[in-house]
Every structure is written in structure tokens, then in C-alpha cells.
Amino acid sequence: FNVGNRKVWNVNGASNLLELRDRTKTHVLRRLKQDILDLPDKIITPVYLNLKSKEYMALMGEYYDWMEDDREKKSLTVQFSMLMKVRQIIAENKINETCELVENIIEQGKKVIVFTNFTDTLNRIADHFGKKAVKLDGKMSKVARQNSVDQFQENDKIKVFVGNLKAAGVGITLTAAEAVIMNDLSFVPSDHSQAEDR
């Protein structure tokens, strides 16, 4: 259809799907993960924590006061920034418990992946495990990222992979791990399912 002097294509929906399938069937190969990899079923176990640090309590008090104080007058950017600050404090307050969970898994002779959204949290968890851990974040080069993946997959001394949920949550294979821990969650549920499938 035309908009002004321009011709615009309507790309809503699809047509001629059978013809498309016939023409591409000799060139397209589709394999599903469940058809190729023999992986065990996922077991999801929520772990609830009671956060009581002074920093957390102070920030939550500030956040609730802020929420009650006519937040419609504040821009979405300010609202999002405040929410991110709260999320980051929560992530930092979970580090000790996350490290304890990881240590329990390592004691069983298993490898574990830890995902987080925040670089400071990622670094603190990786530093806690020292030479037993590798990390992957968005600042790393492709070569460094692949090195972290290879080390985790192939080196028996490396027991912990700590990754940024966005940077390490897709496009890599970490099948050496038997457990995945989400230190903190994304706003997007599909990020979690992608990361769990590493």
C-alpha cells in the first residue's frame, strides 16, 4: 500500500507457507535440542532468603517512601533507576548464600554455573572461588569468552562458571555443569529459560 509518495510493504502474517516449505526443504536443516542432546530433566528448586542488611533495609525504606510520594511526577528513567538500585542491593545481599550453595555443590564433585545481572556481583562471586572459577561478562572479547567456556568444559579443576545473564545466557554450551544458580533474576522470563539450558 502507499503512504504519501512511498510504497510500504505489509509484513503482517504469512502467505504461501506450503510453497516456501517445499522450496526450502532441501536447503534448511532443523534440529531440536531434545532430538540431539540427551540431557536430564530440569529440577527447579526455589531458595528463599530473608534479607536484613542495614543497607538493604535503608534502601527499601527509601524506596517505599519514594513510591508513596507521588511517583507520577517522576520520569520513567528515575523510576527505573531507583528500581535497579534496589535490585543491585538485593543481588549483593545474596552473594554469601549463593557462595554457600555453590560450595555445597562443589563438595559433591559437581560443576556449577552462577548467573547474575550485575558486574560487581559477578566479580565478587568469581573472586570468592579464585582459581576454581572462570567468568564471562559483556566486557570480554570473543576470544576471552570462548577461553572461559573451554576452561569450564574441559578443565576438571575449574568448578564454577560465573556469567552475566545477558552475555553468557545464550549461544554457549556449558554441559559440564550439573547445577545452575540464578543469583538474581532478569525482568525477562525467557532470559532465565535460555540461561538454564546452557
Question: Where on the chain are the PLM-derived regions?
Answer:
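A short beta-strand element within the Helicase C-terminal
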Residues: 172-185
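Conserved helicase ATPase core of P-loop NTP-dependent helicases/translocases
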Residues: 111-115, 123, 130-168
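Alpha-helical structural signal in soluble globular domains
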Residues: 99, 124-132, 198
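Short alpha-helical
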Residues: 93, 120, 143, 169, ...
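Phosphate- and divalent-cation-binding pockets in alpha/beta enzyme and binding domains
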Residues: 58, 121-125, 191
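Inter-lobe coupling linker of SF2 helicases/translocases
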Residues: 1-110
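Short glycine-/polar-rich loops that comprise or flank the Walker A/P-loop
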Residues: 42-44, 131-132, 176-179
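Conserved SF2 helicase motif VI
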Residues: 188-198
